[in-house]
C-alpha cells in the first residue's frame, strides 16, 4: 500500500513498471520553442531534468514516429516551484492524418503545496504516427514559460 502524510507532495511513481520506448531513436521532435539550458531530450528520460520553453506563452511539442506505434501508457510530469498559475494542456494522437484528443486538463500550481502534476494515461492506441502536446502555461495570459519534467511513453 502506498501512503503519504496529508499536505505532502505526491511521490513520483516508480520508473520501472513500464517498458518505456526509447524516443531518442524511434521519433523526431518538432518544437515551437526550446531553452538551450533545458532541451526537449531531457524530458524523454526518467530524471533527465526536463524541457523548458525559451519564450513565454502557449507551446507545442510534437513527437513524429519513424514507424507507426502501438501505445499503452503515457506519463506526463509537470513541475512548477516558483510561480502560482493555472496551466492547461491538450494531448492528442494522430494516425493516417486524423488526430484525436487523449486529454485536455487544467492544473493549479501553488507553491509550496501544489507544485507537481503527474498524469498517467492508460491507452490502447494502434498505428500512432505522432503525439502532440500543447501547453498553455498560464490561462490568465501571464508571461509564464511552459515546461515539462517528463514525457514517457510505453
Where are the regions that the model predicts?
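Extracellular carbohydrate recognition and processing domains
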Residues: 100-123
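Disordered, acidic Ser/Thr/Pro-rich linker "stalks" and the adjacent N-terminal cap
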Residues: 1-66, 81-83, 152
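Aromatic, loop-rich ligand-recognition surfaces of beta-strand-rich domains
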Residues: 43-100, 120-154
Amino acid at each position: 500500500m502506498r501512503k503519504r502524510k496529508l499536505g505532502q507532495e505526491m511521490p513520483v511513481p516508480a520508473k520501472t513498471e513500464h517498458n518505456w520506448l526509447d524516443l531518442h531513436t524511434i521519433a523526431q521532435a518538432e518544437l515551437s520553442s526550446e531553452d538551450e539550458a533545458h532541451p526537449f531530450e531531457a524530458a524523454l528520460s526518467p530524471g533527465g531534468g526536463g524541457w523548458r520553453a525559451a519564450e513565454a506563452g502557449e507551446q507545442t511539442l510534437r513527437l513524429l514516429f519513424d514507424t507507426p506505434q502501438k501505445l499503452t501508457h503515457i506519463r506526463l510530469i509537470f513541475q512548477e516551484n516558483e510561480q502560482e498559475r493555472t496551466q492547461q494542456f491538450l494531448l492528442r494522437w494522430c494516425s493516417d492524418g486524423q488526430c484525436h484528443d487523449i486529454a485536455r486538463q487544467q492544473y493549479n500550481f501553488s507553491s509550496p503545496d501544489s507544485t507537481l502534476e503527474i498524469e498517467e494515461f492508460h491507452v490502447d492506441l494502434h498505428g500512432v504516427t505522432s503525439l502532440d502536446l500543447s501547453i498553455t502555461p498560464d490561462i490568465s495570459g501571464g508571461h509564464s514559460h511552459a515546461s515539462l519534467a517528463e514525457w514517457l511513453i510505453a
